[in-house]
């Protein structure tokens, strides 16, 4: 997917977070120009690659998104922004729906209005709930058991619906807990 777009502009949300910052570094190393949107609520600006452009604001800010999208042509958007703590999602389910679904939807509606319709979305394997086997396959039963997973699945369903309308192309990443150190 990325080889088809080499030397292009990429818009990346959540690039000051653990996964997003690692992806940003890899994209820059591969020759991409990366613009990062991050509100820095949970991210750390020190993780952002020096060669990336960092825009600090919330992804639901249509005016600022429009300004960025009108400044250059982006080949794709990689969406890593969002809230990620399962325990917190149980205490504040509406907050997780707001950040992981509602704000993401506003962001992508704005992107699509500018013709930016290639999307890679960072979801979670938590959408499978408690699987019956250690080998989880993409086509296994979806059964989220916490508000975090439900908010991610809700946005996945939004992407699927928009693809059926012919408005976008997407890749959804459903990985398990990511851990590591820099």
Which residue ranges define each predicted feature?
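N-terminal Rossmann-like NAD(P)+-binding domain of SDR-like oxidoreductases, especially those catalyzing
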Residues: 1-181
